From Swiss-Prot:
Its cofactor is Zn(2+). Keywords: Metal-binding, Oxidoreductase, Zinc. Belongs to the zinc-containing alcohol dehydrogenase family. PANTHER family: L-THREONINE 3-DEHYDROGENASE. Zn(2+) 1 binds at residues 38, 60, 145. The keyword Zinc applies. The keyword Lyase does not apply. Transmembrane segments: none annotated. It comes from Bacillus subtilis (strain 168). This is Uncharacterized zinc-type alcohol dehydrogenase-like protein YjmD. Zn(2+) 2 binds at residues 90, 93, 96, 104. Member of the exu locus which is required for galacturonate utilization.
Length: 339
């Protein structure tokens, strides 16, 4: 069968590998239908993902159809449509005991630490698979995992109905955060450098948008919130300067949610954090967000609405990665098909 593998930086190959088989009673064999290309996949391709090990079959935004199940599998049967939860964990470390396996001491992420889903068939434990409606188009189902990232950020920021939320960055993850924040009942302002992205954010529910090259973000936030500041700031740009801006723009008693892995230091003093008693929290992957997202997808309350802009056959995967590399402003989300 075909599998898309990054062997080293910029060395992407479509390899012929053996089709996996069930070896444990709790395992499920899935025929892959769609795989989204995430920013982290591009970082693996570029050799700049600090967490990935190579060579690696990439892909963690995966949907497909169950082909076979192990003897002890109860929740799934052949023919079911599923989405993939890409994390495995030990279940016994401090993070797992606290109900946060997404930061398990022995965390393994599908497509990052272990071979992922950009191949024709995969085998995973039942607990990493969630059934979705067979009426749900594959291009909608493949967005489940990115939506869980948005749901996690909104949960970590404790976003509630009536809150004002500033989301920095109107890229794919920023839009996923936007969708989940609006479903939570928040008013949302979004920032970006790109007017087309900001227009798309407005189409998807943003109440206000700011081009950071044309306007002063913190001043606009104060105007928008009646001088209060944003109750929650979610940084999906993930640069030292946007982290610092988050602290400036957040309201007293507010939350700042950080999604990035930038190792550079930000210039932030203690004073605004303590004076405003700001809660700063990281948000990584997701914890128990799949059931909520699946329910929203099945009910038609979550739709990509233009977020998926490009689809490529697995036979054209090299062209897909080259196109994203050369035309990043044209691509919101690209999806690889395995039909």
């Amino acid at each position: 069968m075909k599998a898309v593998q990054v062997r080293k930086a910029y060395d992407l190959v479509t390899a012929e590998v053996k089709k996996p088989v069930l070896s444990k009673d709790d395992e499920v064999l899935v025929k892959v239908k769609r795989v989204g290309i995430c920013g982290s996949d591009m970082h693996i391709y570029h050799g700049t993902n600090p967490l990935a090990t190579l060579p690696r079959v990439i892909g963690h935004e995966v949907t497909g159809q169950v082909e076979a199940v192990g003897a002890n599998v109860q929740s799934l049967k052949p023919g079911d449509h599923v989405v993939i939860e890409p994390i495995s964990y030990c279940g016994s470390c401090y993070a797992c005991r606290k109900g946060r396996p997404n930061v398990c001491a022995k965390l393994s992420v599908f497509g990052v630490h272990e071979d992922g889903g950009m191949r024709e068939y995969i085998v995973l434990p039942e607990r990493q698979l969630h059934a979705v409606s067979k009426d749900l188009p594959w291009e909608e189902a493949v967005m489940a995992e990115p939506y869980t990232i948005g749901a996690q950020a909104v949960w970590r920021g404790q976003v509630e109905k009536g809150d004002t939320v500033l989301i920095q960055g109107a890229g794919p993850i920023g839009i996923c955060v936007l969708k989940m924040a609006k479903l939570a009942g928040a008013a949302v302002m979004m920032t970006d450098l790109n007017n087309e992205r900001l227009a798309f954010a407005k189409e998807n529910g943003a109440d206000a948008v700011v081009n950071v090259q044309a306007e002063h973000v913190a001043e606009r936030v104060l105007e928008w919130t009646g001088n209060e500041g944003a109750n929650v700031v979610i940084d999906a740009v993930c640069l030292p300067e946007t982290f610092a801006l988050s602290i400036e723009a957040v309201s007293p008693a507010g939350h700042v949610v950080v999604l990035g892995f930038d190792e550079r230091a930000a210039q932030i003093s203690q004073l605004p954090i303590t004076k405003k008693e700001v809660t700063i929290t990281g948000s990584r992957l997701q914890t128990n967000q799949f059931p909520k997202v699946v329910e929203l997808l099945n009910g038609g309350r979550l739709m990509h609405n233009g977020l998926v802009t490009h689809t490529f056959s697995v036979d054209d995967v090299h062209h897909a990665f080259q196109f994203i590399k050369e035309h990043p402003d044209q691509v919101r989300k690209a999806v690889i098909t395995f039909d």
